[in-house]
Amino acid sequence: MSYKLMLVENDIVLSKAIQEYLIDQGFNVYIANNGLEALNLAYQYNFDLIISDIMMPLVNGYELLAKLKKNKALSKIPVIFLTAKGMTKDRIKGYDMGCYGYLSKPFDPNELLSIINNLIARDVLKEASLQNSATSNQQLNHKIRLTPREKSILDLVVDGLTNKEISTILNTSVRNVEKYVSRLLHKTNMKNRTLLVKYSINNNLLNNEINERANDGTRTRE
């Protein structure tokens, strides 16, 4: 089983180095450069583990962990802190908040791998993965219900068409298309068209033909 990890680190060089190391170990690794970006990614993908720095702009690591714990769909994702905040009081705060590991920089990547493998051996990642999948399916079954018209417009949005182009194809007004796009954003809880497209592809909201084209190379126009 290939586990899906998110690395939250605002040091671009360090994040790339860690990503390459973990990919070599067989993991799928996504990168977020701050806590806010991490939250947006967490809502889109079912991560098995999050490795996060603490000192970051917008949303710091402690705040990120607190927000994850408050969300039923994300609360079981284990978090490992990887940070320069190495004081005992900082480590205690992290563990009290529910982190599964705390590594101080500079660190040995083999120690990080050991912590991850320990979580795998204890089935912590498997439990998080199953919980994420169940929650995701439940959300799709009970919350994301699209009308035929919404599905038609969503397919065209994923194809990269503008509202004007969609209105021409469907023989309706631009304002009416805008209304449906706004409704789709609301139903999926996405902030813009790009995130809507990614969410739709990842959660199979499209028909098979559109999904195959999208996976070949998604293009969107804001």
From Swiss-Prot:
Domain HTH luxR-type stretches: 139-204
The residue ranges marked as DNA-binding region are 163-182
Which CDD domains does this one have?
A: LuxR_C_like, REC_Ycf29
- List, alphabetically, the Pfam families matched: GerE, Response_reg
- Write the record's keywords in alphabetical order, separated by commas: Chloroplast, DNA-binding, Phosphoprotein, Plastid, Transcription, Transcription regulation, Two-component regulatory system
Among its keywords, does the record have Kinase?
no
Which SUPFAM superfamilies does UniProt cross-reference here?
A: C-terminal effector domain of the bipartite response regulators (SSF46894), CheY-like (SSF52172)
Domain annotation Response regulatory: ranges: 4-120
Organism domain of life: Eukaryota
Q: What protein is this chain from?
A: Probable transcriptional regulator ycf29
**Source species, please?**
Pyropia yezoensis
